[in-house]
Amino acid sequence: MKIFIFIFIMALILAMIRADSSEEKRHRKRKKHHRGYFQQYQPYQRYPLNYPPAYPFP
């Protein structure tokens, strides 16, 4: 009886892992499609362009 419970739990874990990985694959394709056609790549800027320096330069 214990072995059947163990097998059931392992099958449930494997099914959850497979469902999660297939969802990630679907989202990867969608992101790639949207980035190429609709969005331009914009690098991250730490500070705005008109941000004053923290201390005056000598």
From Swiss-Prot:
Q: Which residues form the signal peptide?
A: 1-19
Q: In which tissues is it expressed?
A: Expressed in mammary glands.
Location relative to the cell = Secreted
Assigned GO CC terms: extracellular region
Record's keyword terms, sorted = Secreted, Signal
User: Which GO BP terms sit in this record?
Assistant: defense response to bacterium
> PANTHER family this protein is in?
STATHERIN (PTHR15057:SF3)
What's the protein here called?
Answer: Histatherin
